[in-house]
Amino acid sequence: MWTGGRRPGRLRRAASAADMEKLRLRSAWVPSCLGQSRNLQGRRARSSPSLWDSSLQEQKGELRKRLSYTTHRLEKLENEFDSTRHFLEIELRRAQEELEKVTEKLRRIQSNYMALQRINQELEDKLFRMGQHYEEEKRALSHEIVALNSHLLEAKVTIDKLSEDNELYRKDCSLAAQLLQCSQAYGRGRKMAELPAEFQERMNLHAEKPGCSLPAPPRRPAYADSVPPCVLAKVLEKPDPGSLSSHLSEASAQDLGFPEGLEKPGSRPPYKGDIYCSDTALYCPEARHQDRRPSVEGPGSDVGFLQAQNSTDSTAEEEEEEEEDTEAGAAAYPASYRHEAFGGYAASLPTSSSYSSFSAASEEKEHAQASTLTASQQAIYLNSRDELFGRKPAAAYGSSPRYAAAAAAVAAPLEAAMAPGFPRTVSPFPGEPFRFPLSPGPQPALMPPNLWNLRAKPGSARLVAGAGRGQWRPLSVDDIGAYPFPAAAAAPAPSLASPGGGFNDRYFGARGGPGDNAEGRASPLYASYKADSFSEGDDLSQGHLVEPRYLRAAGDLSLSPGHSADPLPSYAASEGDRERLGVQLLGASGSPEPELSLRSSRDSLEPSSMEASPEMHPGARLSPQPAFPRAGSSGLSRKDSLTKAQLYGTLLN
């Protein structure tokens, strides 16, 4: 709405002047003339035109100055901006280069890390596979170790069983040889021609050994070619292998010629040839190829040093010999006790569970190992063999007056029947002293103790042949081991001279004195053999086996042939006997008997052939334990073994 013609214009002019004043106050360089009103400028221009022109000129100059100043400042800012932009561009390029370098480095690191990861993965897989392989090998080796341990255990059990069976078999054969020595010949000796050819060859080999020569024949033609039972027993006797390991450190070079047959006289004790020259002896290696049976070893095979013997072969040989002995002396025994009564045992020895059948395989192993022995090892073996078997005999029972009287009673009839001039030749044993016959003194006779006299009355000197045939029955361990020797009424007869020294002289010794107390003493043949038959649970002398020579019968036992074989009465002794046994065991100083320890079956069943000379050490009273200790049941008891030996004919000579 319009309110007047002049009023709106007047208001607009006032507003413009006010705006210009504000603009001037806000910017100092704005000229002051611009802020003046147009009316004021017109009034000044009308009043003084020259003054107005000068003010305008001043304002123009001031504006030019200000414009130049602003332009210069803008140029400077532009230069600064350009320089800053250039610097920033350079910095940006540098940062980009560094970024590229860092990126490349990171890329390489990442690639290396990936490669290392792949390598680590491959190595882990390889290690895992190797670990699995080694675990499988470990399990396989563990199974092999378990199997080898089981095999070793089985081998150890087998070795122990074979050792026990071998010891048992050796004692049985030694017992058979001892019974052959002590058996009754009924005035008829074995002739050399009656023996089997193989046994004759063995006898010849035994005679060719140094110190093993056969005795010279007597002057009577009836005994011209007879073979004494002692020589037969020596050939049939089984040796005690013993332990060779303790003597291997003391070797000597003097036995190097032994395998070649160059042994010198006196290099070892000569009596060993009497005992260790049998078919199963492990100590005569140079003659073993001649002693072996052709069924086990071929004629062309090379017998090595220290080759093992097959025990069943030697048993078969002994059976053949016993069969020949049975045919030769059949008239001396009843028909019920000949080999025909035991038809199942006429052939070779069957291999039982007790005597194992591993000897053939072990013989092959020994044959393979024999070629690896050197001369020094052979010398060590020979020297240890010489030292091992040079032991002293236990001759306590040989010095008993009752033993001498019993042996003399047996030897008296034969001494009267033989030629009076039985010559004494040079002894084939260089190490033994000469022993001439002496009439006085309790010197034991030549003949061994007669087992048949043990069953006769004390006054009888010898059984009649017919009575022996009628009353004969097999002896057992209980019959012989428990009964004392009978007191013979006959005086001791002088010893019979023989080329090799007396049999009793060499086997049982001559040591003893007048103070020997032999009352109730058990037979020396079965003494320690019976002692080994003790069970381990017997409470006798605090669980230890007592020397059987102290075990006496409780009463006066009848030794008639019809007497039955009862158990040993001294094993279940009365109170008085037990007290007497304790006195004999503990009070050694009050007893005239020498104190002896436990004797193994080897010492009494396999007597040594060395003479009991005065040079023997009297202080050596103890003997070692058996080489193979008895452990458990071997499947064959001692009495069964004796029965088997009886059935095989070892008592039929």
Swiss-Prot record:
It is a peripheral membrane protein. It comes from the Eukaryota. One of its GO terms (cellular component) is cytoplasm. Coiled coil: none annotated. Residues 243-252 have a biased composition (Polar residues). It is found in: Cytoplasm; Membrane. Its main location: cytoplasm. The modification Phosphoserine is found at residues 249, 278, 295, 314, 400, 427, 523, 533, 535, 558, 560, 564, 613, 623. Residues 241-271, 288-329, 587-653 are annotated as: Disordered. This is Brain-enriched guanylate kinase-associated protein. It comes from Ovis aries (Sheep). The lineage of its organism: Eukaryota, Metazoa, Chordata, Craniata, Vertebrata.
